[in-house]
Amino acid sequence: ANKRPAWIMGHMVNAIYQIDEFVNLGANSIETDVSFDKDANPEYTYHGVPCDCGRSCLKWEYFSDFLKGLRKATTPGDSKYHAKLVLVVFDLKTGSLYDNQAYDAGKKLAKNLLKHYWNNGNNGGRAYIVLSIPDLNHYKLITGFKETLKSEGHPELMDKVGHDFSGNDAIGDVGNAYKKAGVTGHVWQSDGITNCLLRGLSRVKDAVKNRDSSNGFINKVYYWTVDKRATTREALDAGVDGVMTNYPDVITDVLNESAYKAKFRIATYDDNPWETFKN
């Protein structure tokens, strides 16, 4: 049977030591917060208060240091290497910036990743990267990122980069933002809310419908933050590709239940995260 590859996405992994912690609990993907200084430089991997219930909100690294740690965790042959860790979502906290700084934020983000993660294109980290932007008005971050990799001589690295708008906007509005940014693929669509609150699955179902339609723009759908078995089952039943969680072991347990084992498998490096799964 053709099983849907699933991404178990460790939520709020902002200290380097947490990479091991979350992957060892079953995550094959992590989400990391990125905060910016007033000049649109990515500064810290930091969430801050408030954050998910039951989590410390204050763990952080300098962004460049985190990237170096992440590179080690995703470079075959390194002592810290995890073959299982194949996708990283950067939750870009651009709310602190003016709309007209989005391009610069993308440019500076690209330079940081190029140097500290991709090692200037020389045997850098291998994980796929999703740039997750909270505000549709900040679509020029994508343009800045793409144009910088090109001008720095590494346009091929965009093959490893995907996109997400995380503001729970209407799906049509998200599609329009991608048109403006010139994005025609590599689209993950998030939907969700902090684990302190409940949220239904109606928009997730809209996103799945777009993904599975012949003219949709979405390749993968993920739901956050899912900490309970019942919610995990509901999300999987709705057909998501990824579940973001504070407890990767909980999601792993559910995926091991016979009903889900028949339909899903844990995604590996050979699963292209930009390809829509066809049953």
UniProtKB/Swiss-Prot annotation:
Spell out the disulfide connections. Answer: 51-57, 53-196
Residues of the active site:
11, 47 (nucleophile)
Q: Which domain of life is it from?
A: Eukaryota
What Gene Ontology cellular-component terms does the record carry?
A: extracellular region
Q: Which UniProt keywords apply?
A: Cytolysis, Dermonecrotic toxin, Disulfide bond, Glycoprotein, Hemolysis, Lipid degradation, Lipid metabolism, Lyase, Magnesium, Metal-binding, Secreted, Toxin
Query: What is its cofactor?
Result: Mg(2+)
- E.C. no: 4.6.1.-
> What is a single molecular function from GO for this protein?
toxin activity
Q: Which residues are glycosylated?
A: 256
What is the activity regulation comment for this entry?
Answer: Inhibited with low affinity by edelfosine.
- A Pfam match: GDPD_2
Q: Could you say which tissues express the protein in this record?
A: Expressed by the venom gland.
Reactions performed catalytically: an N-(acyl)-sphingosylphosphocholine = an N-(acyl)-sphingosyl-1,3-cyclic phosphate + choline; an N-(acyl)-sphingosylphosphoethanolamine = an N-(acyl)-sphingosyl-1,3-cyclic phosphate + ethanolamine; a 1-acyl-sn-glycero-3-phosphocholine = a 1-acyl-sn-glycero-2,3-cyclic phosphate + choline; a 1-acyl-sn-glycero-3-phosphoethanolamine = a 1-acyl-sn-glycero-2,3-cyclic phosphate + ethanolamine
Keyword presence, Transcription: no
A GO BP entry: lipid catabolic process
The reply to whether Metal-binding figures as a keyword in the UniProt entry is: yes
**Binding site residues for Mg(2+):** 31, 33, 91
| Details of cofactor binding | Binds 1 Mg(2+) ion per subunit.
Which EC class does it fall in? Answer: lyase
Quote the subcellular location field of this record: Secreted
Concerning its family, UniProt says:
Belongs to the arthropod phospholipase D family. Class II subfamily.
* Task performed by this protein: Dermonecrotic toxins cleave the phosphodiester linkage between the phosphate and headgroup of certain phospholipids (sphingolipid and lysolipid substrates), forming an alcohol (often choline) and a cyclic phosphate. This toxin acts on sphingomyelin (SM). It also acts on a broad range of lysophospholipids, like lysophosphatidylinositol (LPI), lysophosphatidylglycerol (LPG), lysophosphatidylethanolamine (LPE), lysobisphosphatidic acid (LBPA), lysophosphatidylserine (LPS) and lysophosphatidylcholines (LPC) of varying chain lengths. The substrate preference is LPI > LPG > LPS > LPC >> LPE, LBPA.
Q: What is the recorded name of this protein?
A: Dermonecrotic toxin LrSicTox-alphaIA1i
Give the originating organism: Loxosceles reclusa
> According to the entry, what is the taxonomic lineage of the organism?
Eukaryota, Metazoa, Ecdysozoa, Arthropoda, Chelicerata
